UniProtKB/Swiss-Prot annotation:
Keyword annotations: Cell membrane, Cell projection, Chromophore, Disulfide bond, G-protein coupled receptor, Membrane, Phosphoprotein, Photoreceptor protein, Receptor, Retinal protein, Sensory transduction, Transducer, Transmembrane, Transmembrane helix, Vision
Lipid bilayer topology: Multi-pass membrane protein
Originating species: Cambarus maculatus
Name of this chain's protein: Rhodopsin
Main location: membrane
Protein modification: Contains one covalently linked retinal chromophore.
Alphabetized GO MF terms: G protein-coupled receptor activity; photoreceptor activity
Name of the gene encoding the protein in the UniProt record: RHO
Quaternary structure and interacting proteins, as annotated: Homodimer. Interacts with GNAQ.
Lineage: Eukaryota, Metazoa, Ecdysozoa, Arthropoda, Crustacea
Positions of transmembrane segments: 19-43, 56-78, 93-115, 135-155, 182-203, 245-266, 278-299
Superkingdom in the source lineage: Eukaryota
Extracellular side: 1-18, 79-92, 156-181, 267-277
Length: 300
């Protein structure tokens, strides 16, 4: 109780019907996420033709999403059943840490997937091919940096606390400069910087794809045929398709996490607008991003 901010005590208990609705949503989300990401990992690891350096990043993405839902799903179900957080202060901190860690690892994995597509499509033969060693180094870097940032609240730079009485996360209601400085930097690290890199890469990817397609049409017109699709062109077309998949995946991630980012910033600067209902659904909606990735890659 000592970790719960006074802000949450001013609100009456939520409508009892909200919890069954939340429980059903989490049940569907949890099953889809665990099954989808497990299948993704299994297929990529057991199909020799798919065991490429670039797909190591896809496997890492599926693993971080699987870990997120594996650790978030059961506690959320318990919370929905009892209508409040009942798992204690220590597990609250561990729960929040794992959620932040997996979210951070997922977004940076998708950023590196996007950068790899940028390297292949925009730079072409001039770009350095992604090797297994380089992909492994990227993945190691992602997890080391993610752990470094997410472990900081355990050492006094911000802290993990209950939010909305049903979940746990970073302390965005604290008014001290040290706590807020963590949220400023962390928001930049897991949202604004990845977004900037993603937009930059996709702008040039789209330009490269458009230029390639125009060149293909012009060449076909000169040869007096309707299309020009040799083996190299088909390969380029496949790369472009993968770029669209990566773009869709990253876009869905940002759509999922933007509400939670806004909750953090509203909590810092306009907490009177922040109710448990908004917090809970923003939090749950953010976790649902782990469902999107296997669906997008399965369609491909």
């Amino acid at each position: 109780l000592h970790m719960i901010h006074l802000h949450w005590y001013q609100y009456p208990p939520m409508n009892p019907m909200m919890y069954p609705l939340l429980l059903v949503f989490m049940l569907i989300t949890g099953i889809l996420c665990l099954a989808g990401n497990f299948v993704t990992i299994w297929v990529f690891m057991n199909t020799k033709s798919l065991r490429t350096p670039a797909n190591l990043l896809v496997v890492n993405l599926a693993m971080s999403d699987f870990l997120m839902m594996f650790t978030m799903f059961p506690p959320m179900m318990v919370t929905c059943y009892y209508h409040t957080w009942t798992l204690g202060a220590t597990f609250c901190q561990v729960y929040a840490f794992l959620g932040n860690l997996c979210g951070c690892a997922s977004i940076w994995t998708m950023v590196f997937i996007t950068f790899d597509r940028y390297n292949v499509i925009v730079k072409g033969v001039a770009g350095e091919p992604l090797s297994t060693k380089k992909a492994s180094l990227w993945i190691l870097t992602i997890w080391i940096l993610s752990i470094t940032w997410c472990i900081a609240p355990f050492f006094g730079w911000n802290r993990y606390v209950p939010e909305g009485n049903t979940g746990c996360g970073t302390d965005y209601l604290s008014e001290d400069i040290l706590s807020r400085s963590y949220l400023y930097i962390y928001s930049t690290w897991v949202y604004f910087l990845p977004l900037a890199i993603t937009i930059y890469c996709h702008v040039f990817i789209i330009k490269a794809v458009a230029a390639h397609e125009k060149g293909m049409r012009d060449q076909a017109k000169k040869m007096g045929i309707k299309s020009l699709r040799n083996e190299e062109a088909q390969k380029t077309s496949a790369e472009c398709r993968l770029a669209k998949i990566a773009m869709t995946t990253v876009a869905l991630w940002f759509i999922a996490w933007t509400p939670y980012l806004l909750i953090n910033w509203v909590g810092m600067f306009a907490r009177s607008y922040l109710s448990p209902v908004y917090t809970i659904w923003g939090y749950v909606f953010a976790k649902a991003n782990a469902v999107y990735n296997p669906i997008v890659y399965a369609i491909s």
